[in-house]
From Swiss-Prot:
Biological source species: Vibrio vulnificus (strain YJ016)
Pathway: Lipid metabolism; fatty acid beta-oxidation
Keywords for this protein: Fatty acid metabolism, Isomerase, Lipid degradation, Lipid metabolism, Lyase, Multifunctional enzyme, NAD, Oxidoreductase
Stretches the record annotates as Enoyl-CoA hydratase/isomerase: 1-189
Descriptive protein name: Fatty acid oxidation complex subunit alpha
Gene label: fadB
Length: 723
């Protein structure tokens, strides 16, 4: 043994050939701070080892190295710039040391080889993979960019254009593509991977492969003419500006880094990369996006714990109520391996549900995600039925009938008689209290809410609503089932609107009040989309949700929270509803809609809206962007905080993920609680108090006032690592 540490070991595997084996005690290998330090010492040991002819990098896991340890990022990023710069210099000195070994090096690449893992293998001379290999640099998705030499080495290995595509998109390449672009030198069968890599290294040792020339290319300036460079970088900047936009600076910074470093050799180019990385790491966007990644891991951990705690795994499911929503739920269940009965009282609805499932499967087929055989198998695992036959075998029932409490209660009561005492019943409702529906059941402990978002196949969030009598076993089984479906389940306690709709309607309330006071809804949409970063402004979102749906839900919320959400007379939603302007579904709402060539609705402003809104809106007046943002966001933020204060939602992490996954809250802001930490709770309280005359929606919750006085934050040190 040449060197041994907790996460890696170095030994001589044949005459003069040493193997660096990454072998962390965890389920995956990561380039955390400890592993980097061990790799540094391992390379020193190799340098001092006599008779060294070549070095192999291998992993004892299915994935080579999944990347750096993201749980350490926020702690590192919180350090002063000088310390962060020193850490990066240290990390880069390690990869330079690997690249500068006086012998050829080969990486044995399998499974996920991402981020720091990819940057590690880029420092080797040769890279051999198998068909499981997925290699890439996803850092821009976290608001940063490669900082271990990825912006320097990748363009020199595969060319600037391909490198910029991979880095700016945060893309991982499958083995075949990686081979085609030169990121891998060979792809072989898994059982031959080690032997092939060893043979490749032997060929390099025997000078059958010119590894020195390959290394020279990586450590020199990029070979681009002035014209080639101008065309390449100008085009890349244009594409990135169009796709990433102004709220996500990392992709553009990566392009600038590659451009600035192109004319320099490795060490100077690394200095440029380091300078830009530090700037990104200190940004609020990086803090928010890394925070979201950690929050996502947090809710996945909760789901895994629930699955382990559940006494029974869901093997079969049933959906009551077909149509688009029922078909979408059935499709998602079947796609993830849980056969499902889809029951309805109308054949036309069953046909619609099966058509929806077939349509979604055809899209998967067209994209090459599944083959015809698998498609047929998935479709066969959805059983449409007009009767309850076989439903007694279902472990979980998802009721997805019309949003009417009497109809839902009747259907749930009826199906309870058809199933065993262990069967879990759930209701896919967006507004009806779970405690109300539970009154119709003999076994309310086996019942909870399971709120899917539309379209089911795209929206990651599922709200799991705990009723007064819901048992822990029921929650555990439903959370586990939602996770099995590929969803992100978040448990909330019962209240009108649950969590997502409860916090959405004060936002719509702020919108209605702005219109009442003379604001232009098209300006509000532009500000909330372009400045704040929502995917849709409130008027457009209401049209997509459906004015009729929003009108109904608004009444439910007003009844549940009369002080904050009770209406003072008619508003814009009422006016449109009464004029039968329901939004996209009937072609006219705040905007008018026509279908484009692809069959997608395209919105346009029409003067016909003006007389409809006139009775409920003051004469138009100008509002500055900040006033619009404040008046829109304060009610939502206050309601989110109240939900945490009242225990409707358990944690800031779950709330922020629910907002991003369920409502499209701008990811670069990280969710409401991350946003509050970013702007400063005391600053938010002072800002909100300037608008308090607008009504109870603008009244700051006591929790925020107390936290502002104490100088507290929501995330504090709980997501901080240590350097």
């Amino acid at each position: 043994m040449i060197y041994q540490a907790e996460t890696l070991q170095v030994k001589e595997v044949q005459d003069g050939v040493a193997e660096i084996l990454f072998c962390a005690q965890n389920s995956v290998n990561k380039l955390d701070l400890a592993t980097l330090a061990s790799l540094d010492k391992a390379l020193d040991a190799l340098t001092a080892h006599s008779g060294l002819k070549g070095v192999m990098l291998t992993s004892d896991k299915e994935a080579f190295i999944v990347g750096a340890d993201i749980t350490e990022f926020l702690g590192l990023f919180a350090k002063p710039e000088e310390e962060l710069d020193q850490w990066l210099q240290f990390a880069n000195s390690i990869f330079n040391k690997l690249e500068d070994l006086p012998v050829p090096t080969v990486a044995v690449v399998k499974g996920h080889t991402l981020g720091g893992g990819c940057e590690c293998v880029l420092a080797t001379d040769l890279r051999i993979g198998d068909k499981t290999t997925s290699i890439g640099l996803p850092e821009t998705k976290l608001g940063i960019m490669p900082g271990f030499g990825g912006c320097v080495r990748l363009p020199r290995v595969i060319g600037a254009d391909s490198a910029m595509e991979i880095i700016t998109q945060g893309k991982a390449c499958r083995a075949e593509e990686a081979l085609k672009i030169g990121l891998l030198d060979a792809v072989v069968d898994s059982d031959r991977l080690y032997a092939s890599a060893l043979q490749t290294l032997t060929d390099a040792i025997n000078e059958k492969i010119d590894w020195k020339a390959r290394r020279q290319q990586k450590t020199s300036a990029l070979t681009l003419s002035k014209l080639e460079a101008m065309m390449s970088f100008t085009m890349a900047k244009g594409l990135v500006a169009q796709v990433a936009g102004p709220h996500y600076p990392a992709p553009m910074t990566a392009v600038v880094t590659i451009e600035e470093g192109a004319r320099f050799a490795r060490n100077q180019a690394l200095d440029i990369e380091r300078k830009h990385f530090v700037k990104l790491a200190k940004s609020e966007e990086a803090k928010a996006l890394v925070g979201l990644f950690l929050n996502d891991q947090y809710i996945k951990g909760i789901a895994k714990k629930a699955a382990k705690s559940a006494n029974k795994e869901t093997q079969r499911a049933a959906v009551l109520g077909a149509g688009i929503m029922g078909g979408g739920i059935a499709y998602q269940s079947a796609l993830k391996g849980v056969p499902v009965i889809m029951k309805d009282i109308a054949q036309a609805s069953l046909d619609l549900g099966m058509t929806e499932a077939s349509k979604l499967l055809n899209k998967q087929l067209e994209r090459g995600k599944i083959d015809g055989f698998k498609m047929a198998g998935i479709l066969a695992s959805i059983t449409p039925s007009l009767h309850y036959a076989g439903i007694d075998n279902a472990d979980i029932i998802v009721e997805a009938v019309v949003e009417n409490p009497k109809v839902k209660a009747a259907v749930l009561s009826e199906v309870e008689e058809q199933v065993s005492e262990e069967t879990v019943l759930t209701s896919n409702t967006s507004t009806i209290p779970i405690n109300l529906l539970a009154k119709s059941l003999k076994r309310p402990e086996n019942f909870c809410g399971m709120h899917f978002f539309n379209p089911v196949h795209r929206m990651p969030l599922v709200e799991i609503i705990r009723g007064e009598h819901t048992s822990d076993e029921t929650i555990n089984r439903v959370v586990a089932y939602a996770a099995k479906m590929g969803k992100s389940p978040i448990v909330v306690n019962d209240c009108p609107g649950f969590f997502v709709n409860r916090v959405l309607f004060p936002y719509f309330g702020g919108f209605s009040m702005l219109l009442r006071d003379g604001a232009d809804f098209t300006q509000i949409d532009k500000v909330m989309e372009r400045k704040f970063g929502w995917p849709m402004g409130p008027a457009y979102l209401l049209d997509v949700v459906g004015i009729d749906t929003a009108h109904h839900a608004q009444a439910v919320m007003a009844q549940g929270f009369p002080e904050r959400m009770g209406k003072q007379g008619r508003d814009a939603i009422d006016a449109l509803f009464e004029a039968n302007k329901y939004g996209q579904k009937n072609g006219s709402g705040f905007y008018t809609y026509t279908m484009d060539k692809k069959g997608k609705p395209k919105k346009a402003f029409s003067d016909e809206i003006v007389p409809i809104l006139a009775p409920v809106c003051a004469a138009q007046q100008a509002f500055d962007d900040q006033t619009i943002i404040q008046r829109m966001m304060i009610p939502m933020i206050n309601e989110v905080v109240l939900c945490l204060q009242e225990g409707i939602i358990a944690s800031a992490q779950e709330a922020d993920m629910a907002l991003v996954y369920g409502l499209g809250f701008p990811p670069f802001r990280g969710g409401v609680f991350r946003y509050l930490d970013s702007v400063g709770i005391a600053n938010f309280v002072a800002m909100a108090q300037q608008h308090v005359e607008l009504g109870a929606m603008y009244q700051v919750p006591q929790m925020l006032i107390d936290m502002a006085e104490r100088g507290q934050t929501f995330y504090g040190a709980q997501q901080q690592g240590s350097i």
